[in-house]
Every structure is written in structure tokens, then in C-alpha cells.
Amino acid sequence: MREVVIASAARTAVGSFGGAFKSVSAVELGVTAAKEAIKRANITPDMIDESLLGGVLTAGLGQNIARQIALGAGIPVEKPAMTINIVCGSGLRSVSMASQLIALGDADIMLVGGAENMSMSPYLVPSARYGARMGDAAFVDSMIKDGLSDIFNNYHMGITAENIAEQWNITREEQDELALASQNKAEKAQAEGKFDEEIVPVVIKGRKGDTVVDKDEYIKPGTTMEKLAKLRPAFKKDGTVTAGNASGINDGAAMLVVMAKEKAEELGIEPLATIVSYGTAGVDPKIMGYGPVPATKKALEAANMTIEDIDLVEANEAFAAQSVAVIRDLNIDMNKVNVNGGAIAIGHPIGCSGARILTTLLYEMKRRDAKTGLATLCIGGGMGTTLIVKR
């Protein structure tokens, strides 16, 4: 089978809930990132054979947001596009699925990634279809229902983090320490301009002129253990998971161009990385945050590698509790993981996050001249997905 490379990667800044992107749809964010990824790959939109793009909260956005983004980016109508929803893993799974198609010869060049605007997720009125026959009619938050609730146990994702904290004996202090490290690293990285190269500015038109958003909005400078310790448990009365040691509710898009290695050579393109292996696995939905462990073991086995062979790791910080469990059980060197902060600081726009962490990983690998990298996320519903790349 053919080798597959990543030719380019670009992302928007990550916006806060109700922040800069509150009126910029996931499609618009996706188009901006897609155009930039295509430009950075030094190809034209008509060279894209197919688009596979992640998106989770798509209610009210119209049919197949991947198709909307593809056409918005100038890709011809003859080229197909498909939206992928494997919740938080969508943006990364799109990459591994595209690599399968390319390896088999079904495509040469593909657009992959993900886009999400959690701020714009609508409320649903299920009883409105046939009429609320008697009593009050409830509004259902589609963001919670379709993105942040465990359908199998009927509770919030935060409870799955509490379950892990209890089962793995992870203390509140350990969680806050990881959260603090994430914030401090992200604050430092942003101040040093480390995210600038990967971010494409989003121009928002307004009555008083244009606003340019080119900085991650959610990072909280000046975070301390004292401030984190004051926060109350968010999901359980005597729990340990707080707003401070959990990821944010965010908006953003990240896109990449992947292609056959032989096509890159033909076009004279120097890729960011080569895709080595990938793995997706399931766990009990009650401990969904543990999903990266079996997924990573699967990817490492496929690559005939050990975790010690990996130079840099981006492990999505859905919650500090699950991050501690994953890092501990995979025996990941803390000096290699989320070196510029993670989702607790930067944010977690769910359908975009897989592509966001991969984009961040690729640029940091380039900066450090790292040879191997691994990106992994836990997935609501009890799964994990991992991708390994090399330079």
C-alpha cells in the first residue's frame, strides 16, 4: 500500500463560549481554515479528490457541513465530501480514514480536519413537532444532548471524569496541578508566539469595521493553584472535577491536506510528516476518558513501536482526571506531553479538537526537529483514537 503524508495544516484561533466567534458558523470557520490549508500545501482546490471533515453539533447548519466547507473553499462540485461524527475524535479520525483511502489508491489528495461552533448550537423543542398536548414544553440544549452527555448512562461527561478520579484514586490536587501546568504552558507559548504559525486569522465584519481574531481566546493568564482550589465541584457535590480542571466549551476549525507520498514527490511538496499508524478502540462509556489507552496501544503495536519511541505527544485534555490516568497508565514522559498546554487551557471545540491537536503537534515537531509524534483523544460514548506520525 502507498505511504501517506501530511502536506499542510492550518487552524483558526480557538474562541471562548459566546466569545469572538459567537456569530461565525462552523462552516465559515471551516472554510477559512480549509482555504489556508490548501494554500499552504501549494496546490489548487481542484486537486482535492475528496473531503472528510469532522463536525458534531450540526443541528441547524444545513446538510453535510463537509460539503458546504469544501465548496466554500473552492473545491469543484464534482469532488465529494462527507461529514464524520465520532464526537471528540472526529477531526483526528478524518485523517486516519483519509489515509486508508489514499493508501488503497481510491484518492491521491484529500482535505481533512474538523470544525465546531459550540456557541451557536441551538436549543431543540422536541414536542413542537406534534404539539405539546398538555403542560409545559421543554427546550433541550443540543450542545449538552448531542455533545456533552453520555447517552448510555444519562449523565454529563463530567461524571465520567469523576468515575475515573474515583477508580484511579486521582486527587483534586493532582487534577489542579495538571490544569495549572496546562494553563502556564499555554500562556508562555502564546506570549512567545508559538501558535502564530499554525493559526490563520479570521476576519469578522461588523458595522464599526472588521475584527481580526488570530489569538486563542480561552487561555487564562495568571492561573494559580490558589485560584483553582477555590472553584467548586461542577458535576457532583463532593466531587473533584471543576471548571478549572476541565476543558472549555469552545469554537474553532482546523484543516489539513493529506496525500500519497508519491504524489507529494511528483508535485515537489515537502510534507510536514508521514502517517505511520493509527488506532481506535472502545472502553466502558462510564470511563470514556480512558479511551486513549487502548487506542494508543493499538497504534503503537501497528507501528511496532513503544511509547518511549515517541518524541512528542498531544493528548487531549478533556478533563484533568482522565488525562492523569492516561499519562500514568501509558507511562508517558510529562516532558513530552502537551508541551504548549492542552485543551484545559486552549479549549475543546469538540469536532475540531482532533485536527487542532494534530496541527499543534506538527508545528511543534517541526520547531524541535522531533522525529516522531502521537496525537490522541478520548471520545464520548466510550472510545479513544490515536494517530502516530514521523518526520
UniProtKB/Swiss-Prot annotation:
Q: Which domain of life is it from?
A: Bacteria
Its localization reads: Cytoplasm
Keywords annotated in UniProt: Acyltransferase, Cytoplasm, Transferase
Coiled-coil region(s): none
- S-S pairs: none
What the entry lists under Pfam families is as follows: Thiolase_C, Thiolase_N
Annotated Gene Ontology cellular component terms: cytoplasm
Query: Which terms does the record give in the GO molecular function aspect?
Result: acetyl-CoA C-acetyltransferase activity
Q: Identify which residues the record assigns to the active site.
A: 88, 348, 378
- EC code: 2.3.1.9
Task: Give the UniProt family note.
Answer: Belongs to the thiolase-like superfamily. Thiolase family.
Cite the record's note on assembly: Homotetramer.
> What does it do?
Catalyzes the condensation of two molecules of acetyl-CoA to produce acetoacetyl-CoA.
Specify the protein name.
Answer: Acetyl-CoA acetyltransferase
Q: Which organism does this sequence originate in?
A: Clostridioides difficile (strain 630) (Peptoclostridium difficile)
What's the encoding gene here?
thlA
